C-alpha cells in the first residue's frame, strides 16, 4: 500500500478555499494525495487551483463527507490536531515525539487519518474523542495558532 493511500488528511468545515488549495500543495510535498472535506463552506475552485500550484491534479481526488464518522469508517488510527489545551485533560503528544510511531504504523500498512478543525475554533471535544491520539505542534507560546496549510507532516 502506498503512503498516499495510507494517510488521509481530513479538514472539518473549512471556510477558506485558499486553505484547501494550500493544503493540497503541502500534501503533495509530503507524498499525500487523500484529502477529505467534511461540510466545507462554499468552495471557490479557481482559488483552490490557484493556491494548490502544482498540486491541482489532486483537486479531482478530494472526497466530500457529511460527517466525521463517515470519513473515518476505514481509519485504523485517528490523530486529532490542536493548538490549545482543553478543560478535559487529554494526553497530548508533540509532532516530533509522535512521528516515529506514525512511521512505524505506516510501515505496518495501517490506515491513518489526521484531523484538522475549523479555522476559527478548531475541533470540538466530541471530534477529539473520536481520535486515538491528540497531537500538538509546538509553536511560540505568544501565538500558538498555525495555519493548517503551513504544517508539514513528515
Residue ranges and their predicted role:
Residues 8-20:
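Short, glycine-rich nucleotide/cofactor-binding loops
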Residues 12-13, 38, 82, 135-142:
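Short beta->alpha connector loops at strand-helix junctions that form conserved
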Residues 20-29:
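Histidine-anchored nucleotide/phosphate-binding helix
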Residues 34-40:
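Short internal beta-strands
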Residues 118, 126, 133-149:
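Short, acidic/small-residue loops that bind anionic groups at enzyme active sites
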Residues 152-153:
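Conserved small/polar residues in nucleotide/adenosyl-binding loops
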Amino acid at each position: 500500500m502506498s503512503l498516499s493511500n495510507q494517510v488521509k488528511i481530513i479538514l472539518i468545515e473549512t471556510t477558506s478555499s485558499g486553505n484547501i488549495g494550500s493544503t493540497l500543495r503541502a500534501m503533495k510535498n509530503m507524498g499525500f494525495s487523500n484529502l477529505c472535506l467534511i461540510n466545507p463552506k462554499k468552495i471557490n475552485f479557481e482559488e483552490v487551483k490557484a493556491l494548490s500550484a502544482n498540486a491541482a491534479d489532486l483537486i479531482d481526488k478530494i472526497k466530500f463527507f457529511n460527517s466525521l464518522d463517515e470519513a473515518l469508517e476505514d481509519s485504523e488510527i485517528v490523530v486529532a490536531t490542536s493548538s490549545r489545551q482543553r478543560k478535559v485533560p487529554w494526553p497530548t503528544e508533540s509532532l516530533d515525539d509522535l512521528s516515529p510511531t506514525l512511521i512505524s504504523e505506516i510501515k505496518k500498512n495501517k490506515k491513518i487519518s489526521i484531523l484538522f478543525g475549523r479555522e476559527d475554533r478548531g475541533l470540538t471535544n466530541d471530534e477529539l474523542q473520536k481520535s486515538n491520539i491528540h497531537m500538538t505542534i509546538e509553536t511560540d507560546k505568544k501565538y500558538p495558532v498555525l495555519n493548517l496549510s503551513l504544517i508539514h507532516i513528515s
